[in-house]
Amino acid sequence: VHDDLSLHAEVKKIDKALDTPWLYVAGNHDIDFDAPDDASSLESFRAQFGPDTFAWEEHTANFVVLDDVIYLPGEKPAYIGGLREAQFRFLQSYLETADKSKLLVISAHIPFFQTSMARETFRSADRLRLFELLKPFRDILLLSAHSHTQSHVRHGPATDWHGAGRLHEYNAGAACGGYWSGIKDAEGIPDAAMEDGTPNGYARLAIKGDDYRLNWFNARQQPNQAMALHAPKVLRQGAYPGFAVFANVFMARHDTVVEVRIDAGDWHPM
């Protein structure tokens, strides 16, 4: 809602029309910036959506929602990613009894990995404590947002993960994309592509058995469009072949294999 907390009620009204359960995650634009301290910084959010930290169980997976935006009144920026002592007590109590063989999905707003080289964006000590609590679990999916880009992080020793299970963080793109910026179309809607070229839209998590699948859906493009291709539209015959073809695969990981071929030719790695 971009700091306009009066829109919370309208968001609920629109979401209700979709007739599906919603688990709301608080973000930095949901803060009461006139609050005197962190403890009271989500009073408006809680009044509309309920608790900011809770667990939700399904037969396929267990879900935990965390408010990881620590409000720092008077500072710039006025928040940092992290967790509070009360949240750690909740996590310790809940995770002790949760089924360790089921997928555990943790949703928060600020990414658990560091997004800036200039400063700490998520408190490292809090991440270390959280990851210690997650060690007994076989499969953990972290869902984060905030960056208005998309990325996948496989946590390991470099990011304080020392468990035997898989710890995958998906930093999801935004419905508003690049803050509703860019050239407007005939209907007046901005291009809204994010910094990494991903179009605005939404992600879908599908859980089946012991595995899950993540897909990105463009808000206004073909529903199955998984990438954008960038190549010259016209090539002069006999010209020096100094051109490039770029593929922006919206849900790619660092180890994703992307190949290209021309007509019925051989596939070549990109």
Where are the regions that the model predicts?
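Extended active-site neighborhood of metal-dependent phosphoesterases/phosphodiesterases
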Residues: 2-100, 119-143, 149-208, 212-215
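Active-site segments of SGNH/GDSL-like serine hydrolases
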Residues: 26, 102-118
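Short, well-ordered beta-to-alpha junction loops that form the rim of enzyme active sites
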Residues: 68, 107-111, 146-147, 217-219
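Short, compositionally biased P/S/T/A/G/V-rich stretches that sit at domain boundaries
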Residues: 203, 207-243
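Short edge beta-strand/loop segments characteristic of extracellular beta-sandwich folds
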Residues: 244-252
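Beta-strand-rich binding/interaction modules
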Residues: 245, 256-261
